[in-house]
A protein has these predicted regions:
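Flexible "cap/lid" loop of the alpha/beta hydrolase fold
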Residues: 15-50
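Short loop/helix-cap segments at secondary-structure boundaries that form the rim of catalytic
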Residues: 13-15, 101-104, 117-125
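Short beta-strand/loop motif that positions the catalytic acidic residue
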Residues: 109-111, 115
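Catalytic histidine-centered segment of alpha/beta-hydrolase-like enzymes
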Residues: 132-147
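Short, hydrophobic alpha-helix immediately C-terminal to the catalytic nucleophile
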Residues: 9-14, 145-146
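Conserved alpha/beta-hydrolase catalytic His-Asp/Glu region
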Residues: 53-100
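Short, hydrophobic alpha-helical segments
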Residues: 148-153
Length: 153
């Protein structure tokens, strides 16, 4: 599972008997959430995020930074296509209020060292992708393919 999908897969693994759960750009417990997410949980400030700006923000970034960024933005739009505001509000609530106290035992956690969504400062027991950000699954697919070929075969 990637990002929020990592949380979902860990919850699914409590229902089915998974041998391993692989998460990328995610967290293994609420202790690993960013300090801003922990603050948002306590204050409920996440309820006031204006998520409708996402599409307009992407268009602004593409306009300001040019074709190279526009290509990257289009890639994100293709692979990160769930943008419904109700879904985003719901998923942020589920992430911020996740009640997983301790990591489950069978998790393989791969994480970029430059991830700003889930910064590594709070993470333990993960496989680092140097200079990888939250979108390592898109930007570092070669590294991931090589890792999986060597370690999961």
């Amino acid at each position: 599972g990637v990002s929020f999908g990592g949380l979902i897969m860990q919850e699914v693994s409590k229902i089915i008997n998974a041998k391993k759960v692989i998460i990328i750009s995610s967290v293994k417990s609420r202790k690993e959430l960013s300090n801003s997410m922990k603050f948002a949980r306590k204050t409920k400030s996440y309820k006031f995020l204006p998520l409708s700006w996402i599409d307009d923000f992407e268009n602004l970034i593409a306009f300001v930074f040019g074709p190279k960024i526009k290509k990257r933005v289009n890639l994100y739009k293709k692979y990160l296509s769930v943008r419904d505001q109700k879904y985003l509000d719901w998923s942020i609530d589920k992430i911020v209020n996740w009640d997983q106290e301790e990591p489950i035992k069978n998790v393989i956690h791969i994480h970029g060292t430059y991830d700003l969504i889930f910064p590594i400062i709070n993470l333990k027991n993960y496989i680092p992708i140097k200079k990888g950000d939250h979108a390592v699954i898109l930007k570092r697919a070669d590294w991931l393919n090589e890792y999986f070929s060597k370690n999961l075969a």
